Amino acid sequence: MAVVLALRALGLGDLLTGIPALRALRRAHPVDRIVLAAPPGLAPLARLTGAVDAVLPQPGLDRPLATEDRPSLAVNLHGRGPRSTDLLRATRPGALFAFGSGSQCPQWIDGEHEVDRWCRLLAHYGVPADPADLGLDRPAPASPAPGAVVLHPGAAAGSRRWPVDRFAAVAAALRADGHRVVASCGPSERDLAAAVGAEVVAPDLVELAALVAGAALVVCGDTGVGHLATAYGTPSVLLFGPTPPTEWGPRGGPHTVLWTGGRGDPHGDRPDPGLLRIPVAAVIDAARRAVRAPAAP
């Protein structure tokens, strides 16, 4: 069986924005084995895409791709290269799809929406992809808090973390409206979630997907949790900064994006000034307009 190897050794949001490209590869290679090189913790969600047969553990670009079989096709869904492309070349693929500087390669476009970028890459090589094909299969486990409003104060970088005391104010307002409010967190974010003043839920990745899929509303920054809301069509209020939503935000659907403009360092340690300009009142108002009605007692 031929192997198609796709590299996207990044985070949760990166995996989810890459779904249309992965599904396009699946349609183009229906009988081949699609292998995704990605962090091993993402394997359970990769399986929910319905496009991936196996995950090759690859937490970054610091080690070679440990492939057992020479791929018939290697696809760089990771970045513009050269490191990521060189890793794929080292597997000696029969063909390689990647951005590059040569006249025969598609060119990287700064500021392009992340979903569109990888769809365009594949289209250059004759593989059509649908940028709207972002849905994810629902996981088997039930939600740990069905019908709740989910606030997620964490983010991979401090520059994308809206202050936790503001999340606490939003939680208090929505709880007063009659909603069950929970604060979700990763393993290292329990103290941050506890400061929201709501019930803390610390799910694993599959449970997190179930939590978001069954939520009445998600409120978070520019994080993978927001992309889960997009994947499941869950209403969301997304607080953007310092990266603009034109590059990473949802398009259409029951999602409200708050963004005050201005770019900054998406990997910085301190909250972005633009993110700090989003007031509590605006988030509460957006949440009240977006939230599904609270469940009957």
Predicted features along the sequence, with ranges:
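Catalytic machinery of carbohydrate-active enzymes
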Residues: 1-297
